[in-house]
Swiss-Prot record:
This protein is located at the 30S-50S ribosomal subunit interface and may play a role in the structure and function of the aminoacyl-tRNA binding site. Belongs to the bacterial ribosomal protein bL19 family. SUPFAM superfamilies: Translation proteins SH3-like domain (SSF50104). InterPro entries: Ribosomal_bL19 (IPR001857), Ribosomal_bL19_CS (IPR018257), Ribosomal_bL19_sf (IPR038657), Translation_prot_SH3-like_sf (IPR008991). The keyword Ribosomal protein applies. One of its GO terms (biological process) is translation. This is Large ribosomal subunit protein bL19. One of its GO terms (molecular function) is structural constituent of ribosome. The keyword Metal-binding does not apply. It holds the Pfam family Ribosomal_L19. GO terms for cellular component: cytosolic large ribosomal subunit. Keywords: Ribonucleoprotein, Ribosomal protein. Disulfide bonds: none annotated.
Amino acid sequence: MDLIRKIEAQNKKNEAFVFNVGDTVKVVYKIIEGNNERLQSFEGIIISFQNKGIGKTFLVRKISSGIGVEKIFPVYSPIIEKVEVLRRGKVRRAKLYYMRNRIGKAAMKIKERLNFKRS
């Protein structure tokens, strides 16, 4: 078990991610198409985390043309350039899967935490 922890410690990024479930984030990540490499962003609400050590992931949901789109991002992936927190959400659940059943404006409506200072 110590060997696994050593390898995980080496592969973790030094910067701390300071976002939680319910936050509205903009994830900028690299896409490689043949020889070209470009940056693409995905903006939405974090609806869950899966905590598995170095394999920690978070699920971001957005509404695009009236259709819900979800994308899973590994926290320690080298393809993620940055994660920018746009709004802090005030939620009382660890998993916001109930957001999948909402339609219209209610699908993206979460109360905002008031003591949020944008960096």
